[in-house]
Amino acid sequence: MSFVVGVGGSGSGSGGDGGGSHHHDGSETDRKKKRYHRHTAQQIQRLESSFKECPHPDEKQRNQLSRELGLAPRQIKFWFQNRRTQLKAQHERADNSALKAENDKIRCENIAIREALKHAICPNCGGPPVSEDPYFDEQKLRIENAHLREELERMSTIASKYMGRPISQLSTLHPMHISPLDLSMTSLTGCGPFGHGPSLDFDLLPGSSMAVGPNNNLQSQPNLAISDMDKPIMTGIALTAMEELLRLLQTNEPLWTRTDGCRDILNLGSYENVFPRSSNRGKNQNFRVEASRSSGIVFMNAMALVDMFMDCVKWTELFPSIIAASKTLAVISSGMGGTHEGALHLLYEEMEVLSPLVATREFCELRYCQQTEQGSWIVVNVSYDLPQFVSHSQSYRFPSGCLIQDMPNGYSKVTWVEHIETEEKELVHELYREIIHRGIAFGADRWVTTLQRMCERFASLSVPASSSRDLGGVILSPEGKRSMMRLAQRMISNYCLSVSRSNNTRSTVVSELNEVGIRVTAHKSPEPNGTVLCAATTFWLPNSPQNVFNFLKDERTRPQWDVLSNGNAVQEVAHISNGSHPGNCISVLRGSNATHSNNMLILQESSTDSSGAFVVYSPVDLAALNIAMSGEDPSYIPLLSSGFTISPDGNGSNSEQGGASTSSGRASASGSLITVGFQIMVSNLPTAKLNMESVETVNNLIGTTVHQIKTALSGPTASTTA
């Protein structure tokens, strides 16, 4: 076979040296003057043999071939690019044919199974098949379970009168092994609906039903069918985006300007000159552009990172504080040779800042993965205009993503570019205006920092749980440590969804931001089963994020802010380190004055990095905790996550200017933004309806907590602006 190659090097692709942009920017006269020729049979034969040995030759190999064959190095480079593209197309056609045949086979089997189900009969009772709508059956079973619990409580009360002692109720959890915690742990007193404190199980008012809001039209859909006409268009958009991202990753000035001594900000004027656009994207005066670049070293190899980036479930777990929702809508290409090289996915994604004051950003985008050279991968995201996509936020993602380069000892260097155009339909709250307008809240540095912290967390799994930093050797096995970390990860994800303004959480806004900035939502939870209220607010403190983090994570200072502890001391009885910073850990806490009649403990994870910190906790039953510590699946352990996220307020650069007062009542000196979120079980009845008394109670709870934190950290004269 032969390829037509221009003498001027204007073949397909641009290797990051600007060849592709010259091809597009050249005038009609220049294109007519370019001369083309075909390679000789001997040249092609030599190139083919070299391609079989190494499809990705380096510069030294390309120069050697250039001397042997009498061709320019650029011609060698473009020949290999074209050959790889042709080989990829051949593999894709073969894969598509095989997938189509397999799809036809599965479709026939599906039809046969559906027909068989229509005539299915239960072998035990001879009855008809199950209902086609399991929702009502599930609700009926939950109501029956609630009645059975009431009957059990009534019978236990009657039996206790005759036996002269209380009868312990049956545990709803599976049998478990005895843990060392059994001998050392009691529980917190006065922990609300989990102990003997004030209950939120009120008489529910009729007519105040809580309807679950529908998800986004794309988020709730199954995989979309992409036509054969659209696939080449998507592939072309992805390849163009990859070329642009490579230029942005590899070029410094004048495209990028260094600010704050460490952040790279895109020079929009230079960008428009290098990447002129025929559309109005990036030119609308009503839109604001945020573009930044950052890099860092992470403790994970490139292939493992690529695997996580191309899996939406793992992607969401990797960035729980940034990604509110992520779903693969269609797989246009699954990659080559069992890897993600050439993989192209169509995604729905929603980005968040952990605060009820900041709206989320929704994107329908293409994610493309390509190996640039041995040990180096590029993952690019770019918005795609899909007719079915109706966005609540007018946001567009220009070519963004990262370059991942393998380094020795299992490390990788990650260089990240984030380039977003957004329209602010509502005025950004003054607390977050600075960090959002400066591109910090959704910027590249936050992505890299979060990735570094999460990779460090994953790496801690290889550290034995009985290290000197663990207390008492409670976590005895690697399986137990892994199970505890999975439980804590689910707790964090649950908390992040409860405090953000995601459009895709299955919840109802009960009370929008009131006069003190508290937002209350309600949803039906499977674990624990029932109706859950979520309340969240954000407030400012003049203290540094690290000081606030140290105060909130320390069990010795917990009674100063934890309303539900009733001022009782708390002690740490188990500890798992999951990072180099001493504050990055998972803890199990108990009340020092608790009695053995209440077996409720507190599971807590704290984490800090340069972008911020969080302290998240949840009451957990002792029996359930034993399940996790024995290494069993913790997926069904009930969790009601509460906690705090702490981030810089973005005014660090102003701290030397005297801290002039602003209209919000807070000084412009560096401080912290704290988001506090509580989740409380209102009722264990699946058909429960909500009353306003429970909303008022949770508002009072969160308001009291905020006041006590401000009093403890800022003193009586501190700012009270929320």
Curated annotation (Swiss-Prot):
Species: Arabidopsis thaliana
Comp. bias intervals (Basic and acidic residues): 20-31
Domain of life (superkingdom): Eukaryota
Family as reported in the entry's similarity comment: Belongs to the HD-ZIP homeobox family. Class IV subfamily.
Other comment: The gain-of-function mutant edt1 (T-DNA tagging) exhibit enhanced drought tolerance, increased root system development, reduced leaf stomatal density, increased levels of abscisic acid and prolamine, increased resistance to oxidative stress and high levels of superoxide dismutase.
Known DNA-binding region: 32-91
Keywords assigned by UniProt, alphabetized: Coiled coil, DNA-binding, Homeobox, Nucleus, Transcription, Transcription regulation
Listed transmembrane segments: none
Chain coiled-coil ranges: 81-161
Official protein name in the record: Homeobox-leucine zipper protein HDG11
Gene: HDG11
